[in-house]
Amino acid sequence: ACNDLCGPCGPTPLANSCNEPCVRQCEASRVVIQPSTVVVTLPGPILSSFPQSTAVGGSASSSVGNELLASQGVPYFGGGFGLGGLGCFSGRRGCYPC
């Protein structure tokens, strides 16, 4: 009969010449729409460096001052000309890099 001619759920074929109604119940459809991935780029820390060594006056006066502090055992942290401006730590035996 006509039930065998029922096509899949969807539009009815135009060539169906059967006089009996063709009824077929299809299952409910479920469509899952997933959002696309969103990439957010946050700026990282901005690192900048500035030279810390500054010299005022001549190098002789600076070195004399450092030796005076070193002879008294006073810690000295300064710019100076040594080790990229890191200064030194003066102990009883001399000036050591930090």
Curated annotation (Swiss-Prot):
The modification N-acetylalanine is found at A1. The keyword Chaperone does not apply. Signal peptide: none annotated. GO terms for cellular component: intermediate filament. Keywords: Acetylation, Keratin. Belongs to the avian keratin family. PANTHER family: BETA-KERATIN-RELATED PROTEIN-RELATED. This is Feather keratin. It comes from Chroicocephalus novaehollandiae (Silver gull).
